[in-house]
Amino acid sequence: MSTASKVVLGLSIVLTISTVAGVHIKQNWDRQRLREGVVRDLERLERKRENLRALEEQIQLTRELVTERNRRQAEASETH
C-alpha cells in the first residue's frame, strides 16, 4: 500500500470517527435539552397553580374586607 493510500485511509477513518462522535454528542445534548424543557414546563405549571391560589386568596380577602367595611359603615350609620 502506498503512502498516499495510507494517508487517505487514515484521514477517512479519523473523519468517520469524528462524524460519529459528533452526532452522538449532539444527540445527547438534544436529549438533555428536551429533559430540561419538560422540567421547565413542570415548574411553570407549578408557578401558575401557585399564582392562581394566591389570586383566589386575594379575592377572598377582598370580599371579607368589603363585607367588614360595609358592616362597620352600617353600624356607624345606625349609631348616628
Curated annotation (Swiss-Prot):
Pfam families: PET117. GO terms for biological process: mitochondrial cytochrome c oxidase assembly. One of its GO terms (cellular component) is mitochondrion. It is found in: Mitochondrion. InterPro entries: Pet117. The keyword Transit peptide applies. Residues 1-22 form a transit peptide. Its main location: mitochondrion. Keywords: Mitochondrion, Transit peptide. Belongs to the PET117 family. This is Protein PET117 homolog, mitochondrial. It comes from Danio rerio (Zebrafish). The gene is pet117.
